[in-house]
From Swiss-Prot:
One of the record's GO cellular component terms: ribonucleoprotein complex
HAMAP family reported in the protein's UniProt record: Ribosomal_uS11
Name by which UniProt lists this protein: Small ribosomal subunit protein uS11
Pfam families: Ribosomal_S11
Function: Located on the platform of the 30S subunit, it bridges several disparate RNA helices of the 16S rRNA. Forms part of the Shine-Dalgarno cleft in the 70S ribosome.
Oligomeric and partner information: Part of the 30S ribosomal subunit. Interacts with proteins S7 and S18. Binds to IF-3.
Keywords for the protein's UniProt record, in alphabetical order: Ribonucleoprotein, Ribosomal protein, RNA-binding, rRNA-binding
UniProt cross-references to SUPFAM superfamilies, sorted A to Z: Translational machinery components (SSF53137)
GO BP term, example: translation
Length: 124
């Protein structure tokens, strides 16, 4: 039988929002970068194109923040990465979470200084 995971009491944390065109992944860490909780649209049962919707991102945030609050998180900073549609909605949902105070918001999307050639444009 597996041992029950010990509850940590961490007051401050960082929420990483990775918003791709296909999915939105939310990871809550402590200040050192150790993962406390995570959630994604796909992990919540959204399939296919429904994973990339703003609603799916909101649900993923609610799930990850509920797990984080169990561990005592009260203050978070937000780091957002990627161009996905769930990006803005996820940030708003974190801000609207009861009992959580947002300290900073930072965009950490990697931008090339003219690196790799991008994929060809779609012709539909």
């Amino acid at each position: 039988m597996a041992k029950k995971k010990a509850k940590k009491s961490i007051a401050k944390g960082v929420v990483y929002v990775a918003a791709t065109f296909n999915n939105t992944v939310i990871t809550v860490t402590d200040e050192m970068g150790n993962v406390i909780s995570w959630s994604s649209a796909g992990a919540l049962g959204f399939k296919g194109s429904k994973k990339s919707t703003p609603f799916a991102a909101t649900e993923a945030v609610a799930d990850a923040m509920a797990k984080a609050k169990e561990n005592g998180i009260k203050e978070v900073g937000i780091k957002v990465q990627g161009p996905g549609s769930g990006r803005d909605t996820a940030v708003k949902a974190i801000g609207a979470t009861e009992g959580i105070r947002v300290t900073f918001l930072k965009d950490i999307t990697p931008l090339p200084h003219n690196g790799c050639r991008p994929p060809k444009k779609r012709r539909v």
